[in-house]
Amino acid sequence: MDKKLLMMALLITTGLATHAQEKLTRYQVRNAITVRTPIMNDSINPKGEKHTAKALLQTPVVLDLANAPTQMTAADTAGLVTFAKADKDNLLYLIKTQLRAERFMKGKLKVTSPVRWELFMNGESKMVKDASEDSISKAATKEVALRLEPEMDYEIAIKLLSTPDDKTVPSLKCELVKDDKFKEVACSTDPEQKHRFSLDNT
């Protein structure tokens, strides 16, 4: 009997943990943007510093994809989306999705990638990773705090930078982790979901 109770408790705990953490699986992706490193006399900035891959991540990109060439991309079973690696020129990918919680919710978005990236929420920069690793297995994971109001749309945009010097292909995994108190709050993560407008939008 004790063993049965223990097994049931483990199953319930596992179910709650699974419900509290989910992988994002669909993204809207803008076609890669070529970013060339300055050469010759332009190879240093006004401060006399050499241009670096970290600086390339600061290249301005229009986050609105309404008129941009895009495609829908699905993650694999591990939750990873993978893109073509830069060959001669650096490449910037813009990856977008949307979050909407049914009720007020707090949690975090865990982002894992072996290349450099910057994350925006509703157009505001929230996190920058300016170093690269040798493989996805060694990739650093960073967490972005979330505070979602009921039925509000939150646009997540990630700039992913691939350089010829990177040791691996650019890939990305995002996981939504709800705080314990909000495990049962439903939250959609669909890049194609229709926006909901409030009085502030009119």
Q: Which residues are covered by each model-predicted region?
A:
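Positively charged n-region of N-terminal signal peptides that target proteins for export
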Residues: M1-L5
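Short beta-strands within extracellular/lumenal beta-sheet-rich domains
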Residues: D87-L99, T141-K142
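Beta-strand-rich ligand-recognition modules
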Residues: M121-S171
